[in-house]
Amino acid sequence: MRDIIFTFFNYFVFFYTSMLAIFFVTFAFLSFISLKRRKDYYVESYMRKTIKESPYTPGISVIAPAFNEEKTIIDNVNSMLALEYPLFEVVIVNDGSTDSTLEKMTEYYELVEVPYAYIERIKTRPFRRLLKSSNPKYSRLIVVDKENGGTKADASNAGINVASHPYFICTDVDCILEKYALYRCISPIISSEKQVIAVSGTMLMANGCVVKDGQIIDVRTPRTPIPLFQNLEYMRSYLIGKMGWSAINGMPNVSGGFGLFDRSVAIAAGGYDAPSFAEDMDLITRMVGYMCDFSRPYKIVQIPDTCCWTEGPPNLAMLYRQRTRWARGLFQTLNTVSYTHLTLPTTSRV
C-alpha cells in the first residue's frame, strides 16, 4: 500500500510540474508574439500625436474612491490632474470620509457645490452632492460626496454614474499613474476592428522608487525581499501570463488597481458587485457574459507598457491578508458566475 501511494505521488508531482512547465512555455511564446506585433505597429510618440490631433479621440474618466485620505489626498489628486491626454476628467468619490479629506480638497481646489441631476444607473449608497472647482485650473476635477458604502465597489459605481465619458479607468487614490498612461490604454481601442471592452495596463511595485510631486522620477527595485518577489511576480503575471491570455482573447481578469473599461458595457452588466471580495474579476466576468448573451464580438487587451505603480504589502502579515482576500474573491466569483460563460476562448468567452 505504501508503494502504491508513493508511486501515485511521484506520478502526480511529475504530471503537475510538466503541465506547469508546458503552460508557462506556451504563454511565454504567445506573449512574445503579442509583444512583437505591438512593437511592429505601435510607436508611442506617433500615437500620442495622432490621438492629440484627432477630433474623434474618445474621452476617459479617471475614477478614484477616497476614504479617510487626508494625509495624501492633495498630492494624489494633483498626480492624476497632471496626466497627459486631450480629453479626460478626474472623478474623486469621497466615500463618507470621517476625517478632513473633503475639507482639504474643498479648500485647496476651491470646490463649490453645483446642481446636478444624479442618475443612478447603478445602485449605490445615497448620493449627497457634487462639487466642482471655481478655479479654471482644476476644471477637469469632479468630486462626488456620498454616504459610506463600506466597499471600494460601491464608491466606484457612484463614480461610473457621474462619469461623462465613454471609457473609465478605476484606480486607487494612492496609486501613481504614469504620465502617458491614458494614451497607452486607449491605443488598442482606436486600432481594433472589434469592440474592446477592457484594457489592462501593467502594474509594478512603487516600493523603493523615488517619488516627487506624485510622479516616479527614479525607478528602483524594492530593497526588501517581500516587495522584491512581488515585483517579479507582477512582471511574470502581466508580461507572460496576461499577455499570453490576451493573444487568444481569454483574459480572465483586469486588475482593480488599474484598468480601462467601456462604460456602457459596464453599466449594462450591472457595474461592480459591492459585496464581492474580487470586484474587478466579477465585473469582467459579467461584462463578458453580457457580450456573449447578445452575440457581440469583443476583445479584452493587455498592454505591456507600465501604466501604474502601487505600494505592495511590506510584510508577511499584510501579504497574507491581501492574498487571502484575492483567493476568497476568486472562489466567490466562480461560485456565482454562470458556467456557460466559462467555455473555451475559441467561442469568445472567458
Regions found by a protein language model. Name each.
Residues 1-56:
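N-terminal membrane-anchoring/stem segments of glycan-assembly enzymes
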Residues 172-176:
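The conserved acidic donor/metal-binding loop of glycosyltransferases
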Residues 114-145, 151-157, 161, 165, ...:
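Long helical/loop segments within the catalytic core of UDP-sugar-dependent glycosyltransferases
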Residues 94-114, 148:
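A conserved acidic beta->alpha catalytic loop
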